[in-house]
């Protein structure tokens, strides 16, 4: 007996029809898209003889790295690139998204831990100022609703820097 085909029949008499892959990133290693593509590639190889299966990949995020990409991938929004300050007030290229009338802002891209070397991390100096700069940029474009992902922030000031920047 072929175990692989038996397991497929257990799930659905005709084999899998639709497979949804929705993984978060592997922090510091692979993005959500890369994880999903690796799994999809493995499934296609494993199930090569069943061309009727449809594999759907959805980018996911816990609100940290990859949140903006996940939203823009799923909702077909606009990516906006600006200059803003990181958590140590250094100028960086930053981006946020606009989906319909809502700005999608990922703190990890502006004031995130990954942007600061471990020896430079200092919660007493880190600020979310650049997040406020993104919000103001979106406001000037007519956006009035904002969704912010707070995971992986290098700050501990509860958004005070961002509010001050606005």
What does each model-found stretch correspond to?
Residues 3-150, 154-166:
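N-terminal loops that bind phosphate or other acidic moieties
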């Amino acid at each position: 007996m072929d175990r692989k085909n038996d397991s497929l029949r257990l799930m659905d008499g005709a084999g899998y029809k639709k497979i949804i892959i929705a993984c978060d990133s592997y922090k510091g290693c692979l993005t959500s898209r890369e994880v999903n593509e690796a799994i999809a590639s493995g499934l296609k190889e494993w199930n090569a003889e069943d061309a009727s299966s449809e594999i759907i990949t959805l980018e996911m995020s816990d609100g940290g790295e990859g949140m903006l990409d996940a939203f823009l991938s799923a909702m077909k929004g606009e990516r906006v690139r600006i200059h803003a300050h990181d958590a140590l007030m250094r100028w960086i290229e930053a981006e946020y998204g606009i989906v319909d009338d809502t700005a999608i802002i990922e703190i990890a891209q502006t004031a995130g831990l990954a942007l600061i070397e471990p020896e430079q991390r200092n919660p007493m100096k880190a600020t979310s100022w650049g997040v406020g700069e993104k919000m103001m940029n979106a406001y000037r474009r007519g956006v009035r609703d904002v969704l912010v992902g707070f995971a992986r922030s290098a700050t501990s000031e509860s958004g005070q820097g961002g509010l001050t920047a606005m």
